[in-house]
Amino acid sequence: MYRSMKSLALLGLLGPTSQVFAHPATGHAHNIGRRGVDIEAFRLPQVGSYTNATEIETTPPIALLKRESYVETATELVKKLAPNSEFRLVGDHYVGTNGIGHVNFKQTVHGLDIDNGDFNVNIGKDGKVFSYGNNFFKGEAPEASPLKKRDFKDPVSALKGAKDVLQLPVEAASASAEPKEGTEVYSIKGTSGTVSDPEARLVYFVKADGSLALSWRVETDITENWLLTYVDAETGTDVHGVVDYVSDLANYRVYPWGVNDPTEGDRVLVTDPWDISASPLTWQSDGTTNYTTTRGNNGIAQSNPSGGTAYLNNYRPTSAARNFDYQYTTSLTTPSSYIDASIAQLYYTANHYHDLLYTLGFTESAGNFQINNNGKGGVGNDFVVLFAQDGSGTNNANFLTPPDGSNGRMRMYLWTMSTPRRDCSFEAGVVIHEYTHGLSTRLTGGPANSNCLNALESGGMGEGWGDFFATAIRLKPTDTRATDYSMGAWVYNNPAGIRSVLYSTSMTTTPNTYSTINGVSSVHRIGETWATTLYEVLWNLIDKHGKNDGPRPEFDSNGVPTDGKYLTLKLVLDGMALQPCSPNFIQARDAILDADKALTGGDNLCELWTAFAKRGLGSNAVYSSSNRRDGFNVPAGVC
């Protein structure tokens, strides 16, 4: 079966054209920003800790803990470390391809979730505790259940409070609340302006000052933003935090895998490009239907000139022979004339990336995006909806990541920085960056929790992971550690790209260290430092293990990638699943180090520590939300 390219876009919304050349945009919820509300002010507080594998080894009561199953071991650990806390097991535990079991817990009070009270436990191959992250509330819980007196605002009032504070385009004058299954969960009927009925759930929320607030978690999908708004249940007007499932990106164009954009190569016709181990149903079937259009188990791609959320009846190319071979040149001036090529490119790139991530460990049980999970765990029914030439914006792209079981949604826009305009579906780096938001959001904190990358430093790493994966995948056979890369250069029509730095191992070209992010409020600027650090890791491991320039990794008998490039991607991906909810740089660093211990027995700790230390994340680095301190030390005995 034949098919041409398909691709997705990346990067965050950049803002007005007059500002784009100076800096990328600073936040995710830019449609809210256009209404005058800065959603950045409502990011979730960064709390919690991560206890790494080395620390576990020096704590015998924990290191020796073992029960009959990995879930029971994890549960026993939480009981020991939080003996006075109520909690529940989140039903998204799984064993990763590296043999590490991941178990997530949610703290509760009087039967209500503390929605940002998370505890993740990682269990090693030996059945013992490997590492853990703890975001549990440690203060005094309220003595009386709020459900007895019920002196709190109703869910409709909370929706109206969220609407007023965030200036949401929602009409709720005639709204009413209908109970759903669960404790104090309601569907709010009679609204307009949302994709689906808003939902309100009574929860507790740990505020930035460490206190606990009874809150309504109001969920609203308003097309460009899918928000969880924590509204104080006592006042109905105070907003304690906002999570946006949508992650913003930039637009890129794609050719065959490894060709980042039209400046790097020509379009070619590829045949059956899927990895059958990652997509056993191929890209053209979901196990029930064999499709002759750009639809399959991993995604569905179509045009979306209206910018809406409907997709099933949108236009997509059809070929009975599955020969998605359409004309495109960069000189074409009317985007609609090459929409078939754009959709095919987007579909190809997204599916190819799905397959690569699958081989690296982003599988069904880990929360990947598939309709049919083939009985391999996870929830399923959540392929990625891919919108080409989306009409809801320009000069950007975005990705929405709800929890496992709900569709991811990618919007690729046209870019107006050149004549003719450029379609970001043809820049693979944009697609990869965007899709990586789905990867990092699903893995961090578990597939059922999409709230764990909302804190400022965590959100910055979300942007950095996207840039890093896109950059690593585009490496060329002749590249060395002296090779520098920009992001989004083609769609932006500027060799410097959309970021303020080049990704480089040169401290002269890009001098960023951990302390560089002090005082920075832009997740994209924070992400530049994280991606730069990972670029150092990449080249240290390539220099040690070589570089596989093929489209897929090769593994040794222990499941370890045999080259430095794919080994780095594997360790970074595994680290996402190990790290706690709302991680900071140091915790994410520790999780990557732990990932190497789990996968290779720590064979690469010298190279990893050396890379981190070069960028200020050595063993003596210190996290503080306002005064991060660089550390350039490598632990004694590591090298």
From Swiss-Prot:
State the name under which the record lists this protein: Extracellular metalloproteinase mep
- Transmembrane segments annotated in the record for this chain: none
Q: Name one Pfam family in it.
A: Peptidase_M36
Q: Which residues form the propeptide?
A: 23-248
Residues the record marks as carrying a glycan: N52, N290
Q: According to the UniProt entry, where is the signal peptide?
A: 1-22
Q: Does the keyword Zinc apply?
A: yes
Cofactor binding remark: Binds 1 zinc ion per subunit.
Please classify the protein's predominant subcellular localization into one broad category: secreted
Q: Provide the gene name from the record.
A: mep
Active site annotated at which positions?
E434
What up-regulates or down-regulates this gene? Expression is controlled by the prtT transcription factor.
Q: Which E.C. number(s) belong to this protein?
A: 3.4.24.-
* Localization of this protein: Secreted
Q: Which residues bind Zn(2+)?
A: H433, H437
Q: What do the Gene Ontology cellular component annotations say? A: extracellular region
The cofactors named for this UniProt entry are: Zn(2+)
What family does the database annotate?
Belongs to the peptidase M36 family.
- Please give the function described in this protein's UniProt entry: Secreted metalloproteinase that allows assimilation of proteinaceous substrates.
Q: Which UniProt keywords apply?
A: Glycoprotein, Hydrolase, Metal-binding, Metalloprotease, Protease, Secreted, Signal, Zinc, Zymogen
The record's Gene Ontology biological-process terms are: proteolysis
What Gene Ontology molecular function terms does this protein carry? metalloendopeptidase activity; zinc ion binding
